[in-house]
From Swiss-Prot:
Its cofactor is FMN. It comes from Aliivibrio fischeri (strain ATCC 700601 / ES114) (Vibrio fischeri). This is Pyridoxine/pyridoxamine 5'-phosphate oxidase. PROSITE patterns: PYRIDOX_OXIDASE. It catalyses: pyridoxamine 5'-phosphate + O2 + H2O = pyridoxal 5'-phosphate + H2O2 + NH4(+); pyridoxine 5'-phosphate + O2 = pyridoxal 5'-phosphate + H2O2. InterPro entries: Pyridox_Oxase, Pyridox_Oxase_CS, Pyridox_Oxase_N, Pyridoxamine_oxidase_dimer_C, Split_barrel_FMN-bd. Belongs to the pyridoxamine 5'-phosphate oxidase family. Signal peptide: none annotated. Homodimer. Coiled coil: none annotated. The gene is pdxH. Binds 1 FMN per subunit.
Amino acid sequence: MELEDIRRDYSLGGLRRADLPQEPVELFELWLKQAVEAKLTDPTAMTVATVDENGQPFQRIVLLKHFDKTGFVFYTNLGSRKAQQLEQHSKISLHFPWHPLERQVHITGTAEKLTALENMKYFTSRPKESQIAAWASKQSSRLTARAALEGKYLELKQKFAKGEIPVPKFWGGFRIKIDSIEFWQGGDHRLHDRFLYSKDQNDWQIDRLAP
């Protein structure tokens, strides 16, 4: 397979300094809204990157579940590889690849655990099947066969057939406190537009970066 000639032009539009609000979350909200309106597949899907104790990076796709000026939120099994890595190294990066809109957003920050109340509010809002799945899977542990996982799910489905399902102690969320957020818009002749918001005490410094 020849990869050298796989490329395309970027022509959907540019991004100017005058277009940028002082708060980066406002621009992110606009771009996410436009991604949803464009009917992109999984517009809230983001790549979450963490590192282990040896500095080895790991990435996976996770769904964004909430965001505001205080940070970006996702949920996971607290025994998962990403959660265990965040216990040791709280630095994290997020990446939203909205290719059809010729846009990317890259976020760096620090992860902190959500409160038990925040976890409960989201967990109880999930479909019952998703709640049971959270109990059934010991995320990132080794499995002998898929049948073992499916059997555990069916066992728990019967156990929790009636009444509310409690929040597992090994399940919860993280809020990513933003250190920086970069907005990338594809441009003509590979002259892409990149703007970096960097946290400067209680304000944001905005810089244009070379593509």
